[in-house]
């Protein structure tokens, strides 16, 4: 409560003896002798009580309680490579007491994911850019490079085609109809992993 006095005709009245009323203004609804705590616009009125037969008077002051501002939540790293293990992106500025989160807070497989962060109390809190809009944080898991061993020691006969040369499981010739010639020649092949969702297909391998 403010300190001071109201002077009337050279007399004084202690602030502690005054009646105090807080009222909301504009769109703020409030009417109490107790000071408000929520964001809004108010007036506080000090009034000499009717029981005081020596003095009369009132004094009003307008004031505003602004919304507390919070840093927006961000994701420290938003792109991960598939590992086979569960991935949980690390956030920055998240406050469990003041914010809610929902969505894809963890994932294992390759894909695009999103987390939504919202303010629990939008009447009293806002982001530092003065907005209260829910935040959508996007993150992703990308394909990993599969382990594979390039086959060696393959032989065939002149006039045959590449398709006649058998490759290990997962490998295919890029141009299987190619006619073979004499000599040591490298040909392009592709390795396709069993899990094509989480692992890259490797093209243009020299064999």
Positions of predicted regions on the chain:
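Solvent-exposed beta-strand/loop surfaces, strongest in extracytoplasmic domains of secreted
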Residues: 1-207
């Amino acid at each position: 409560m403010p300190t001071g006095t109201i002077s009337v005709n050279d007399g004084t009245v202690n602030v502690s003896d005054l009646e105090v009323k807080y009222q909301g203004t504009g769109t703020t609804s409030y009417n109490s002798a107790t000071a408000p705590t929520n964001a809004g616009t108010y007036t506080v009125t000090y009034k000499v009580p009717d029981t005081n037969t020596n003095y009369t008077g009132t004094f009003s002051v307008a004031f505003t309680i602004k919304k507390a501002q919070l840093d927006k939540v961000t994701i420290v790293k938003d792109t991960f490579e598939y590992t086979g293990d569960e991935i949980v992106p690390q956030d920055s500025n998240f406050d469990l007491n003041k914010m809610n989160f929902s969505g894809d807070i963890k994932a294992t497989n390759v894909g695009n994911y999103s987390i939504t962060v919202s303010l629990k109390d939008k009447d009293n809190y806002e982001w530092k850019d003065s907005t209260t809009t829910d935040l959508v944080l996007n993150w992703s898991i990308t394909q990993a490079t599969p382990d594979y061993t390039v086959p060696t020691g393959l032989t065939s006969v002149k006039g045959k085609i590449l398709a006649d040369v058998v490759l290990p499981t997962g490998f295919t010739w890029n141009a299987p109809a190619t006619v073979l010639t004499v000599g040591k020649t490298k040909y392009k092949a592709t390795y396709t992993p069993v899990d094509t969702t989480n692992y890259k297909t490797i093209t243009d391998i020299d064999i």
